[in-house]
Regions:
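Short, Lys/Arg-enriched N-terminal segments with co-localized hydrophobic residues
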Residues: 1-9
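Alpha-helix boundary/capping and short turn/kink residues
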Residues: 30, 42, 96-97, 135, ...
Length: 480
């Protein structure tokens, strides 16, 4: 295994290269600090994409280190906040960022929640299944979802019997997990449900009286409907595996999942319920993804390669509102917090809940509404306060690195140089001219940065930190 972004040469990346690489790492991961960004940019864009798409080349985060800080996990496995804290640790420290980003992506598509089961080990299994299969063939992923105890309980497939079907999973696998409304019939839903009869789990999930042990998939052959079924024009004694295989070959599936990928990685789309009546933001981009899906036989990795190497992806900078998870992870990457395990990791769950998102517990099977719906007066205030409180400390390693970079520019740094240098180090971040003018006016109040004496260096450090908090409070910082 090797270090992601490891230097292959001593070439210096151009500002353009850095901006493009920063864009890729914001979307295919959770951002990068400046040192990481420069290491990435010493490789070609295509090579970095290839590394991102092949996470097995790199070591996983050291979960065993976290276990030493959380010994109570072994005795008490029912606290979702602790597991979400561990997930944040992975997001911030992983050498496999796209693996974690795809886990978050699929968590929104295959929305499954803790509230119904109140069984944390099963939700942890569910997230790990998404992580393992997130860039596999879509068949493999959809099979994993269909056999997942958390999903089975969430959509009542444990109550789907050969003698009495429950259509919940049969409906949602078509409406929300693959094809979208308008591409199937009510008979297709019913026959899909029949095909998944007998797909259940080995023991009831709820917390009491069954305890907090892991749950496994179980197929009950005696509870399965073995009669002939017709699904999307295919007739036979179909079972769940057949349904999944048929779904994966449909152009409607390629188009629906492609639009999800575009919405998550490229630019904000309308909310999913409107997709049957509102066209995509960029139909040609969706066509590109559909073609790769069909040509590759539903290979998610191939579709992602098409997406990340396309001109329309490279041009779509700051076109998505960060989700609460993305926002907090980006601030943590900037501050350098949690580079080592910390017993406060679990508090991050409360932070993102205040911003409108609770990992492992989406509001419904529809998942979270995205884009501008993440933002209202309350959630924006939570974001700004969190960013300011986190970054308003020059002793944090990420903040100290920013101060040192600006100081290395020499004495008597002009206000304009100060503002532009900071925007470059935070992003590079693109601002509206009005926002930049506001920052410049603030910087001009105290003149050039001076570093010649201890007193002036201390004052300049305070000014850098203060301007940094203003930058992350800007409207533009809410965009990914």
């Amino acid at each position: 295994n090797r270090e992601l972004g490891k230097r292959d040469s001593m070439t210096t990346a151009s500002t353009t290269d850095l901006a493009l690489m920063a864009h890729l790492l914001r979307r295919a991961g959770f951002g990068a600090d400046r040192d990481q960004l420069e290491r990435y940019a010493e490789k070609s864009y295509e090579d970095v994409v290839d590394d991102l798409l092949n996470p097995e080349r790199f070591d996983e985060p050291e979960d065993e280190v976290l276990s030493r800080f959380y010994p109570h996990l072994h005795a008490n496995k029912d606290n979702p906040a602790v597991w979400n804290g561990r997930w944040f640790y992975r997001m911030v420290n992983t050498e496999r960022p796209l693996e974690e980003k795809m886990t978050l992506f699929w968590h929104g598509v295959f929305a499954t929640g803790w509230t119904k089961s109140e069984h944390t080990p099963t939700m942890v299994q569910h997230i790990q299944m998404l992580r393992t299969n997130g860039m596999a063939n879509f068949r493999t992923l959809l099979l994993g979802i269909s056999r997942d105890p958390a999903m089975i309980f969430w959509l009542d497939n444990n109550e789907n019997h050969g003698s009495s079907i429950n259509e919940n999973y049969g409906r949602e696998i078509l409406e929300l997990f693959s094809m979208g409304i308008g591409n199937y019939t009510e008979d297709d839903i019913k026959n899909a449900a029949r095909a998944f009869t007998g797909w259940t789990y080995e023991q009831p999930i709820p917390l009491y009286p069954y305890g907090q042990r892991d749950v496994e998939f179980l197929f009950r052959a005696d509870d399965h409907d073995n009669d002939e079924k017709t699904f999307l024009g295919h007739t036979g004694n179909l079972d769940g595996n057949d349904i999944i295989d048929i779904i994966a070959t449909q152009e409607a599936t390629a188009r629906f999942i492609g639009r999800h990928l575009y919405n998550f990685f490229v630019a904000d789309e309308a909310q999913v319920p409107a997709w049957s009546i509102e066209p995509p933001v960029d139909p040609a981009a969706i066509d590109d993804l559909v073609k790769t899906w069909m040509d590759s036989d539903a290979d998610i990795r191939a579709v992602l390669r098409t997406l990340f190497t396309s001109d329309w992806f490279k041009a779509a900078r700051f076109k998505r509102v960060k989700s609460p998870t993305e926002f907090v992870a980006a601030v943590l990457k900037l501050s350098g917090d949690y580079r080592e395990p910390d017993t406060d990791l679990h508090k991050l769950e409360g932070t993102i809940v205040a911003m409108g998102q609770k990992l492992m517990d989406p509001p419904s099977v529809e998942g979270w509404h995205t884009g501008k719906e993440w933002i209202d007066g309350g959630t924006l205030t939570e974001r700004v306060n969190y960013a300011i409180n986190t970054l308003n400390d020059p002793e944090k390693p990420g903040v100290r690195a920013i101060v040192d970079r600006i100081r290395s520019g020499g004495d008597a740094t002009s206000p304009a140089q100060f503002v532009d240098s900071l925007l470059d180090l935070v992003g590079p971040l693109e601002l509206e001219s009005e926002t930049r003018d506001t920052l410049l006016a603030h910087a001009e109040k105290d003149g050039p940065l001076e570093w010649g004496s201890d007193e002036s260096a201390s004052a300049s450090t305070e000014r850098v930190v203060q301007l940094l908090t203003l930058v992350v409070s800007a409207r533009e910082y809410q965009f990914n």
